[in-house]
Amino acid sequence: MAIKLEDKKAIVAEVNEAAKVALSAVVADARGVTVSAMTGLRKEAREAGVYVRVVRNTLLKRAVEGTEYSILNDAFKGPTLIAFSNEHPGAAARLFKEFAKGQDKFEIKAAAFDGNFIAANQIDVLATLPTRDEAIARLMSVIQGATSKLARTLAAVRDQKEAAAA
């Protein structure tokens, strides 16, 4: 089925806009995945703030040209499903990783984050990034732990001086 030139330009523009505002991108091969499973993936992606699209490789190469995701060009072989994370850098990687557990034929090809190429076997690095709320919670627990340790140390010094004075 041939796509009209205007439609191709619209697809390239849409994907390019998604790439410009995205925090990370993940590329996968969805060959052999059922339509109902793909529909479920798209629904989960919308809920997670992830833009998912199946695009022809030539159009995809044009769409990411001039963005930090042009490093993914070598991964654009065969049927390509691309996902851009808009709210959290690890959202698309986490979504695809979870989806791949239930789908034998779903294969993650590569990812890109902050201008760096991430191979499929290293996707866990991106998928395990903490969300903003998780990172803040971790930081607060570290700060709270250090503060309470300082308070206990000061109390011990005070008690020691009081015992020495008595």
From Swiss-Prot:
GO terms for molecular function: large ribosomal subunit rRNA binding; structural constituent of ribosome. Forms part of the ribosomal stalk, playing a central role in the interaction of the ribosome with GTP-bound translation factors. Part of the ribosomal stalk of the 50S ribosomal subunit. The N-terminus interacts with L11 and the large rRNA to form the base of the stalk. The C-terminus forms an elongated spine to which L12 dimers bind in a sequential fashion forming a multimeric L10(L12)X complex. Keywords: Ribonucleoprotein, Ribosomal protein, RNA-binding, rRNA-binding. Disulfide bonds: none annotated. InterPro entries: Ribosomal_uL10, Ribosomal_uL10-like_sf, Ribosomal_uL10_bac, Ribosomal_uL10_bac_type, Ribosomal_uL10_CS_bac. This is Large ribosomal subunit protein uL10. One of its GO terms (cellular component) is large ribosomal subunit. CDD domains: Ribosomal_L10 (cd05797). GO terms for biological process: translation.
